[in-house]
């Protein structure tokens, strides 16, 4: 059995994402951890596959993403890349792997050798030097602002960020800083809709929302969440796309369509 894709769909590249944003075409992103799902998500037209440290939650059973190692991400990145998807492959730099620019570069190189085409890291102004260091060395970077799960203990839990005037102002400063440093994409997680909208209109790079309203350039969900596979309480920003669908591929098709036509997320999925 092979998972290699035979598709006439043009490959999604970093410049392609920028062109989509500039043209007003929504970007559909999902997490992905293996070759079989990479092939399925790619057939459905998913634009970006994220090998997220969320695998610590949904695959390994941890309460947070903190135990996930670089080897874990590299292994699952290689699994996804073997399917040769047309979607852009983005891999998370896990907790503790980008404390210095040099560490970030060495670890990003390992993920790119495994098949990543971009790396994602969590943080704002304080990461500007690291982002610039990576970009200058040909490593495309996706930043992650708002609720950054690797900071769960610093935040005191999984809480909406940017709700106060001071918090919103800091988020705007962070967004300006990461763009100026060269980030080509930014995820906004659990951010009030109005703040995320302001960030999206302020920046020239694409924004990807998760619990950040419908004005972002695109949306992302954890694959298991959008398929209704989650323990405990469902986060507000999650919609179960398996409901009413005959199979997983139809559910993914429905997700991609809903992101593209702007029907997801609705107000009930936002803050």
Curated annotation (Swiss-Prot):
GO BP field: pantothenate biosynthetic process
Q: Which reaction does it catalyse?
A: 3-methyl-2-oxobutanoate + (6R)-5,10-methylene-5,6,7,8-tetrahydrofolate + H2O = 2-dehydropantoate + (6S)-5,6,7,8-tetrahydrofolate
In this protein, the active site sits at: 189 (proton acceptor)
Pathway assigned in UniProt: Cofactor biosynthesis; (R)-pantothenate biosynthesis; (R)-pantoate from 3-methyl-2-oxobutanoate: step 1/2
The cofactor binding remark recorded in the entry reads: Binds 1 Mg(2+) ion per subunit.
Domain of life from the UniProt record: Bacteria
Q: Which NCBIfam families match?
A: panB (TIGR00222), PRK00311.1 (NF001452)
Q: What is this protein called?
A: 3-methyl-2-oxobutanoate hydroxymethyltransferase
Lineage of the species this protein comes from: Bacteria, Pseudomonadati, Pseudomonadota, Betaproteobacteria, Burkholderiales
